[in-house]
């Protein structure tokens, strides 16, 4: 066993009883401490077994728990509003000291999996430190509730963003080290990277992934175009069309079919994602029929 996914932890302390913990603290005193002790105990066991070569992914946390593992957002609904809440939670978690965070792509419960929502969530999940697909109740992106249950187009989108997320691993690791050493998170709301610009506080769907990649996540259904703010002081390369370079300090609108998330690269950076349109075309060529 190389790691654990630690579910629950935040609702296991009965507040209405007179119970006490082993050290004498009441359950009410333990309500926030319990999630920290939960992941800490698991961390210490795993460390004794594996040294530093293991991983813990927890759902519950409180001040101090981020030193022991990475986190995901728990049971999010499979609705557009669920994706919206994940976009907000990613950035809030980052500035609260949880730099390694992800969400259940597609949501976890309550309602049919929607193809467009799943496609948007895959795109967003690519630009999170943790990318995982999380539907339950025998549902998955390879077994949809509605016909066709096996959707080659959706799986091609998954392939596109899984490939891109893997390409980003060295970049992510670089700023994971920075987060560990300095506290500066991997994911940075625009106002954190560009504090002097008012529009950086207003555009909450747009954030920085590290200092050089700007992402503007989409949660609404039916959006065929999207407008986002590009901070002034830099020039920005459209990752979907590297020939399009924009001066910062303006809002831009680009076409956004369901598979496409606005991504811009700071021009003077060393980031090399390639042409995302070409990567998308390659993912389409690999579409397959449902296996026997």
Regions found by a protein language model. Give the residues of each.
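Catalytic-domain carbohydrate-binding cleft regions of carbohydrate-active enzymes
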Residues: 1-292
């Amino acid at each position: 066993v190389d790691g654990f996914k630690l579910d629950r932890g935040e609702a296991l302390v009965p507040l209405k009883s007179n119970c006490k913990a082993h050290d004498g603290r009441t359950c009410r005193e333990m309500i926030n401490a319990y999630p920290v002790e939960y992941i800490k105990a698991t961390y210490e066991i795993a460390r004794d077994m594996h040294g530093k070569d293991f991983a813990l992914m927890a759902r519950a946390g409180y001040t101090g728990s981020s030193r022991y593992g990475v986190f995901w957002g728990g049971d999010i609904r499979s609705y557009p509003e669920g994706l919206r809440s994940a976009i907000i939670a990613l950035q809030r978690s980052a500035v609260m000291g949880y730099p390694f965070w992800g969400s259940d792509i597609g949501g976890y419960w309550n309602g049919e999996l929607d193809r467009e929502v799943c496609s948007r969530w895959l795109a967003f999940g690519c630009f999170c430190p943790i990318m995982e697909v999380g539907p339950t109740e025998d549902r998955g992106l390879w077994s949809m509730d509605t016909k066709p249950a096996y959707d080659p187009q959706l799986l091609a989108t998954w392939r596109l963003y899984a490939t891109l997320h893997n390409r980003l691993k060295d970049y992510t690791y670089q700023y994971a080290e920075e987060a560990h050493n300095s506290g500066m998170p991997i994911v940075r709301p625009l106002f954190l990277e560009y504090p002097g610009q008012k529009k950086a506080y207003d555009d909450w769907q747009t954030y920085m992934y590290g200092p050089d990649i700007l992402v503007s996540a989409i949660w609404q259904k039916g959006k065929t175009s999207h407008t986002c703010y590009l901070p002034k002081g830099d020039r920005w390369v459209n990752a979907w069309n590297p020939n399009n370079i924009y001066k910062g300090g303006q809002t831009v609108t680009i076409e956004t079919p369901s598979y496409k998330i606005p991504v811009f690269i700071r021009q003077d950076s060393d980031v090399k994602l390639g042409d995302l349109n070409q990567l998308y075309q390659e993912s389409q060529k690999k579409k397959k029929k449902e296996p026997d």
